[in-house]
Amino acid sequence: MSASALSSIRFPGSISEYLQVASVLSLLLLLFKTAQLYLHRQWLLSSTQQFPSPPSHWLFGHKILKDQDLQDILTRIKNFPSACPQWLWGSKVRIQVYDPDYMKLILGRSDPKAHGSYRFLAPWIGRGLLLLDGQTWFQHRRMLTPAFHYDILKPYTEIMADSVHVMLDKWEQIVGQDSTLEIFQHITLMTLDTIMKCAFSHEGSVQLDRKYKSYIQAVEDLNNLFFLRVRNIFHQNDIIYRVSSNGCLANSACQLAHDHTDQVIKSRRSQLQDEEELEKLKKKRRLDFLDILLFARMENGKSLSDKDLRAEVDTFMFEGHDTTASGISWIFYALATNPEHQQRCRKEIQSLLGDGASITWNDLDKMPYTTMCIKEALRIYPPVPSVSRELSSPVTFPDGRSLPKGIHVMLSFYGLHHNPTVWPNPEVFDPSRFAPGSSRHSHSFLPFSGGARNCIGKQFAMNELKVAVALTLLRFELLPDPTRVPIPIPRIVLKSKNGIHLHLKKLQ
């Protein structure tokens, strides 16, 4: 082709023309996205019109005060029966549910976890039992259920007691006459110690090894970062989040958590190379949690992939210690602020255990009043404040109101447990609510969720709560610190904004 021919071909004359084209395309894309969001918002408004809510801003939704969510839902319960929409921003809404009939209906269905928020947990805990849905979830649940058979749980009582005694020995050394102790961190180490020994065949004490504090801190950071991300409209995008300061912190915390679980798996695999250890394993009637995973065969005959294995370990490592730490900490606070009930529990335990040098599986069912107090504390302070579902099909509730497929439903256990139409005087600590023979709705008390997707380790957790309460009350009187009243805040588990500080008075 000649030079004259080439010169006759017209190319864009300047960079400004490129910018003009790019600007037009960007504007068209923005208009398309705006229209898309507008239509989605109109669909959401139409879908939730049967459920009144407080006034909301068209763009910012309801004003969410990050650490006042629990107080906010108590206000909603008074003004909006059974359920209420909460707009996170203009094009995202969730229906908060706090009615037992609504709970029963939703928990009896097979709706998946709400993808929008739970997906933010995947980089940390992978797609284990908490995040799985459908047939894969069912296979994993069936595979892991034997790890919580009573034959497995029985010998754990002694292990739990040993871990509690280590914590109490530390408390005796560090508490002074007039000092207070922030108990949550100590209890978290203790519950991690317990789950490591019971479920992961760990030898040694987590509580006496300083290196495990980095894992505890990583879990704390990931809890907070998850909560912050759910409420930040810009951080819904994975690319934006990865380059943000919070995204970098989350990545570092994930790496710390994964290093911990990788070491646990590696250590157990190494132990199982020893023939003597394998022989001991063959003599067991049932395998514990990690050994089930290591020897598991799925329906296709294949063992779990390393990715699936670590996801289940990460999931249960977190759920098996952080939720119970929350439960025990708040139970101790509830007993500290209700000394007459604390003393009655102590007398019951003293008559059963004497000096408390040991506690057995059979003892756990012989402390009825203590169990009533534990349940009442779990009602007021549920370890998991809420769970979410995304409706896979339309639903009609008992009162005739309905929601279409695709709506995000948040089951607020905190709201349910503080609903005055379900629990009269809900803020009053009254263990008699759980007295034998007392009647209540089957779905009015859900500290471990309900339905097919209830907490797989609920019996393990309840046993640990009983052991911790019994042994602690035999050695200490729990007293509140009136200058530092804990402020409950919703994270993945129920935490306190300012810690849980108690006076610990050693009993003679």
Curated annotation (Swiss-Prot):
It is a peripheral membrane protein. Pathway: Lipid metabolism; fatty acid metabolism. One of its GO terms (biological process) is omega-hydroxylase P450 pathway. Activated by cytochrome b5. The Vmax almost doubles in the presence of cytochrome b5. Its EC number is 1.14.14.1. It catalyses: an organic molecule + reduced [NADPH--hemoprotein reductase] + O2 = an alcohol + oxidized [NADPH--hemoprotein reductase] + H2O + H(+); dodecanoate + reduced [NADPH--hemoprotein reductase] + O2 = 11-hydroxydodecanoate + oxidized [NADPH--hemoprotein reductase] + H2O + H(+); dodecanoate + reduced [NADPH--hemoprotein reductase] + O2 = 12-hydroxydodecanoate + oxidized [NADPH--hemoprotein reductase] + H2O + H(+); (5Z,8Z,11Z,14Z)-eicosatetraenoate + reduced [NADPH--hemoprotein reductase] + O2 = 18-hydroxy-(5Z,8Z,11Z,14Z)-eicosatetraenoate + oxidized [NADPH--hemoprotein reductase] + H2O + H(+). It comes from the Eukaryota. InterPro entries: Cyt_P450, Cyt_P450_CS, Cyt_P450_E_grp-I, Cyt_P450_sf, Cytochrome_P450_Monoox. It is found in: Endoplasmic reticulum membrane; Microsome membrane. Its cofactor is heme. Residues 1-37 form the signal peptide. This is Cytochrome P450 4A12B. It comes from Mus musculus.
